[in-house]
Amino acid sequence: MSGVIVVGSQWGDEGKGKIVDFFAEHADAVVRYQGGNNAGHTIWHGDTKFELSALPSGIVTKGQLAILGNGVVINPEALLAEIKEVESQGVTVENLIISNRAHVIMPYHIALDKASETASNNRIGTTKKGIGPAYTDKISRVGIRVADLIDPEIFGKLLKEYLPFKNAQLTKLYGEEALDYNEIYDKYVEYGRQLAPYVTDTSYLLGQQMKENKRVVFEGAQGVMLDVDHGTYPFVTSSNPTAGGVMNGAGVGPKQIQDVVGVIKAYTSRVGSGPFPTELFNDTADHIREIGHEYGVVTKRPRRIGWLDAVALRHAVQVSGLTKLAINSLDVLSGLKEVKIATSYTYKGEEIHHFPASDTWFQGLDVNFETLPGWDEDITDVTKFDELPINAQNYLKRISELLEVDLLSFAVGPKPEQTHLLRPVWE
């Protein structure tokens, strides 16, 4: 076994990128297996900060393959722009590899996403980047894949077949303007020409890597609670950020996975609409939001803030089979007199320990908290677990106990040197 999956285990924005970086330091490949450029991740490489949404985190690490798997939906324009941006920061992208089976986000996906969200009375807070419509076309078997994009003849044939229906939706259903075939064709054929050198059968490539016992890191976007099957449906993304998404989104088997690392923050945040049982609407939320810089990488929207939710996290442990835990942003809680962890819910007088499937349950849900003493010390220069204030140590230990998952690391700031390991990343 040579594969490690790094899974966001809340509602995204947990700091997965820097944990991926730890594994990537001694890995041969880093693979993004789902999502699109709707999910931003911030990583540090030396003193350089990278805000990525289309490229895998491993792109900044020399010597590793940075792979976009078949489960990713790709906006060629955004991807090429991000390539140009990282190159301007001194990164070369010859290690980038794109699956020929990945689906392409087309202009009509973005137009339909924007029109649908604007017209809906029940908005789910989409980033309006065409992710959902692209996945819809994939499931409906009317999508355009990267293999099609890099073949102008096939691409033109498919675009000519699909565009009239998409234009009918835009004009007749939403009253929007129709899109022009020639404009799309010319632009996307050029995108295909530029991306073609990076395209291959990534499932075959990964199979060869793992046969040779190479170390491979699988990087999820978003988080478990946004999974289309296991998240707070319908307020979810359109793919599977859970560990199970790797099998379909990268084309590898479960026997090839050694560990599943769940990444969380020491509190909870969420962007967009949907249930959030531990959400705060007070000065504590404002404190955490400002100290933690809780604004979306892509959307720049202020994130919703709440206490850590062990009920939701136990759900993440169950559906992704977490074997290790990486806890980020512990420093953000410094200065609070007390910190809380949700340990169960009460619904209609009954205590429950599972995360509800029905959105209606959350309207009558009470949250049961365990309160622990906080700490005042600045911990951003701490380098070892036993250097933390005893209350911070106890907080981390309690999280591990409640989830029954061993702690891999804790972070006291955003930079790589502020993340500290309690055990080796590769065992």
Curated annotation (Swiss-Prot):
Record EC number: 6.3.4.4
Reported cofactor(s): Mg(2+)
Active-site residues annotated for this sequence: D13 (proton acceptor), H41 (proton donor)
Domain of life: Bacteria
Compartments, record wording: Cytoplasm
Residues annotated to bind Mg(2+): D13, G40
Binding-site residues, substrate: V297, V298, T299, K300, R301, P302, R303
Gene Ontology terms, MF aspect: adenylosuccinate synthase activity; GTP binding; magnesium ion binding
Record GO biological process: 'de novo' AMP biosynthetic process; IMP metabolic process
Pathway(s) per entry: Purine metabolism; AMP biosynthesis via de novo pathway; AMP from IMP: step 1/2
A single GO cellular-component term on record: cytoplasm
Catalytic activity: IMP + L-aspartate + GTP = N(6)-(1,2-dicarboxyethyl)-AMP + GDP + phosphate + 2 H(+)
Cofactor binding annotation: Binds 1 Mg(2+) ion per subunit.
Binding site for IMP: D13, E14, G15, K16, N38, A39, G40, H41, T127, R141, Q222, T237, R301
Function statement: Plays an important role in the de novo pathway of purine nucleotide biosynthesis. Catalyzes the first committed step in the biosynthesis of AMP from IMP.
Family of the protein in this entry: Belongs to the adenylosuccinate synthetase family.
Protein name per the record: Adenylosuccinate synthetase
The species this protein was found in: Leuconostoc mesenteroides subsp. mesenteroides (strain ATCC 8293 / DSM 20343 / BCRC 11652 / CCM 1803 / JCM 6124 / NCDO 523 / NBRC 100496 / NCIMB 8023 / NCTC 12954 / NRRL B-1118 / 37Y)
